[in-house]
Amino acid sequence: MQDTGSVVPLHWFGFGYAALVASGGIIGYAKAGSVPSLAAGLLFGSLASLGAYQLSQDPRNVWVFLATSGTLAGIMGMRFYHSGKFMPAGLIAGASLLMVAKVGVSMFNRPH
């Protein structure tokens, strides 16, 4: 068995992140009746799940996951910057930024 360098495979973090994003959209809809929050949460959660699945099949196939988390980091980062509210924009922006960093580090640490 080859050592991947990580105790927990990257795709498990990806599935957890996808669940966080999707549940954020569902909670936004439940609390405020926000259909755009529900739609965006489910869309980005589904894309993150697809990206995590692709990572589980081929650890080099990072592009869907990286694009999804990078886009969310940018969008929610701007929302957090303008609103100053940690929930939900700051939380999702921070989690997205962490996922971009984790995927980026894993890209540079893997053998070519």
Swiss-Prot record:
One of its GO terms (biological process) is regulation of heme biosynthetic process. The keyword Ion transport does not apply. It comes from the Eukaryota. The keyword Membrane applies. It is a multi-pass membrane protein. The chain crosses the membrane at residues 7-27, 32-52, 62-82, 86-106. Pfam families: Tmemb_14. It is found in: Mitochondrion membrane. Belongs to the TMEM14 family. This is Transmembrane protein 14C.
